[in-house]
Amino acid sequence: MKDKIIDNAITLFSEKGYDGTTLDDIAKSVNIKKASLYYHFDSKKSIYEQSVKCCFDYLNNIIMMNQNKSNYSIDALYQFLFEFIFDIEERYIRMYVQLSNTPEEFSGNIYGQIQDLNQSLSKEIAKFYDESKIKMTKEDFQNLILLFLESWYLKASFSQKFGAVEESKSQFKDEVYSLLNIFLKK
């Protein structure tokens, strides 16, 4: 039941944020009474913290899965970027975007988790860097790709909400090829 509570809470927090989600909402989503939540968690805060942890674990797992299958070519970079934006469950993208509105009491912990995720992502992106094929420094390459991903996370959260995912995939394809053409040596 604890896992089901967290699973449903992730969806609720991703849609309504921390302040907009009540314990009643969470209890109703798993068909239990609000008082029964306290058997599993001592507060809404602890449910939220566990939900955030699961979100970051999920995103880190995507990075780890890429490490197991990537040949670190430019084509593999395109595939990784595409999967990191469009093959991730919508609620995790929206939860990640919602973290910018998290109450102050969580900010230190969440900021640390964001830094850890960005560090893992940056290390993974660095593996795609090939000096013989890319005409910018490794650091500039990493920063550009991270900036691209962050902007697309915002776009993806809105396109999923408004049902324009396929249109966004086409736009993404065009933009990522433009981006790759900017830094690839000819």
UniProtKB/Swiss-Prot annotation:
PROSITE patterns: HTH_TETR_2
Keywords in alphabetical order: DNA-binding, Repressor, Transcription, Transcription regulation
InterPro entries: Homeodomain-like_sf (IPR009057), HTH-type_Tx_Regulator (IPR050624), HTH_TetR (IPR001647), IcaR_C (IPR041646)
An MF annotation (GO) of this entry: DNA binding
Gene3D superfamilies: Tetracycline Repressor, domain 2 (1.10.357.10)
Complexes and interactors: Homodimer.
Role summary: Represses transcription of the icaADBC operon necessary for biofilm production.
Identification of the protein by name: Biofilm operon icaADBC HTH-type negative transcriptional regulator IcaR
Gene from which the chain derives: icaR
The entry's DNA-binding region: 22-41
Keyword set includes Repressor: yes
Further remark: Binding to the ica operator DNA involves two IcaR dimers and is highly cooperative. In strain COL, the gene icaC is interrupted by a natural frameshift.
Domain HTH tetR-type as annotated: residue spans: 1-59
